[in-house]
């Protein structure tokens, strides 16, 4: 057989396989959360072996470790980082609204208290006359007294 020469000949360029994402020092373990998070998608799904560029054995160990970490609550079942940020913003907005509501309530209460004090002072300054009506038991007559308070 003749060697094929010309434009159809396949080039023999050397290519270098990219480094695996798990280094020799990294352990695939359910407690090693930093390593496990690299292999979970934004939705919280375990990435495929093709995407991860792992060997079959590494992928199996990784799947088991992620599932164990989820069961033991080291990892969430769904990736909620963006959801947590949104919840934090909502929480902050609610706290600010609550602070404003409390300030308004305090101002209203203070205003009402001041109005009550002014009314009480006005009542104290006003001289009122009270009449006490009673029946004198000795004479069986109706007596009235006026008193200043």
UniProtKB/Swiss-Prot annotation:
Name the InterPro entries for this protein. Answer: Ribosomal_bS18 (IPR001648), Ribosomal_bS18_sf (IPR036870)
| UniProt cross-references to Pfam families, sorted A to Z | Ribosomal_S18
User: Which is an annotated GO molecular function term of this record?
Assistant: small ribosomal subunit rRNA binding
Record region (Disordered): 1-23
Which UniProt keywords are present, listed alphabetically?
Plastid, Ribonucleoprotein, Ribosomal protein, RNA-binding, rRNA-binding
Q: Where in the cell is it found?
A: Plastid
Instruction: Enumerate the Gene Ontology biological process terms.
Output: translation
Q: Highest taxon of the source?
A: Eukaryota
Q: Which Gene3D superfamilies match?
A: Ribosomal protein S18 (4.10.640.10)
Give the CC-aspect GO terms.
mitochondrial small ribosomal subunit; plastid
SUPFAM superfamilies listed in its UniProt record: Ribosomal protein S18
HAMAP family xrefs:
Ribosomal_bS18
Subunit relationships: Part of the 30S ribosomal subunit.
Protein family membership: Belongs to the bacterial ribosomal protein bS18 family.
User: What PANTHER family does this protein map onto?
Assistant: 30S RIBOSOMAL PROTEIN S18 (PTHR13479), SMALL RIBOSOMAL SUBUNIT PROTEIN BS18M (PTHR13479:SF40)
- Know the name of this protein? Small ribosomal subunit protein bS18c
Q: Origin organism of this chain?
A: Cuscuta obtusiflora (Peruvian dodder)
UniProt lineage: Eukaryota, Viridiplantae, Streptophyta, Embryophyta, Tracheophyta
